[in-house]
């Protein structure tokens, strides 16, 4: 695992593929992503371009992503990981982490955030007691 990496949080979608490509071209080999960042498709475009242009091979990169809070149940983990792989355009991740150790009730991938976070005067969390 490379000692220095690029965190991909808050990189705007319209700049993300260029930022990732430029970072790889500069020498970054560790990319830290997450489905919650909302830009994994664009990250994947930057990775693909760097690979297609011969800047790097896939096995020279260390790509990390993270499982979001609403997908902690065992029946959702594989689907969440496969969605991340599809969005990134990759066949594998080097590391897949639990983004935050609080399990929330399931919300479909398209929504990602529980409705009680956004559609209420009193935002809150409905935790899900996920067995370990």
Residue ranges and their predicted role:
Residues 9-11, 34-36, 66-70, 98-101:
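Active-site beta-loop-alpha junctions enriched in small/polar residues
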Residues 1-61, 75-79, 91:
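N-terminal binding-site loop/beta-alpha segment at the start of enzyme catalytic domains
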Residues 78-132:
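Glycine/proline-rich, positively charged
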Residues 34, 72, 127-130:
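Short, surface-exposed alpha-helical recognition segments that flank or form part
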